[in-house]
A protein has these predicted regions:
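N-terminal core-entry segment
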Residues: 1-129
Length: 129
């Protein structure tokens, strides 16, 4: 089974994604960013952003950092992922509806963006893969 999944992932191309799936992904992404912007006003977001700025500083030897959204601060990849994910989750209005189980976009999207930002890789096709 794992061989089939691995083969599928290795052979899959961006061009194989149906337009409706891309459109839905982009709509969900915009929704998630809107939730993140609104959620910056929650107490949880303020606490976690302060925590990440204090304990997840970027490594000055590597020059690699990622941003805390709507804040202007840079931290390391883990700090950006943590701050942005928890900010989104603090409002609990993401992933389309409250009945959605798991809220996969809450952690996945901030993690992908933090990694892409740290690697200075801003390709939208890579983002959607």
């Amino acid at each position: 089974m794992i061989e089939k999944v691995s083969s599928f992932l290795n052979e899959f191309k961006f061009e194989d994604i149906p337009k409706v799936a891309i459109d839905n992904s982009l709509r969900s992404f915009v929704d998630l960013i809107g939730v993140a912007a609104s959620a910056t006003q929650t107490d949880l977001s303020k606490i976690i952003r302060k925590h990440c700025k204090n304990f997840y500083a970027p490594n000055p030897n590597q020059g690699i950092s990622s941003s805390i959204w709507f804040d202007g601060s840079n931290v390391n990849v883990l700090g950006a992922t943590l701050a942005n994910s928890m900010t989104i989750d603090s409002l609990d209005a993401h992933d389309g509806q409250k009945l959605t189980k798991g809220h996969v976009g809450c952690g996945l999207i901030p993690s992908i963006i933090a990694c892409m930002e740290a690697e200075e890789n801003y390709c939208s096709k890579d983002f959607l893969r």
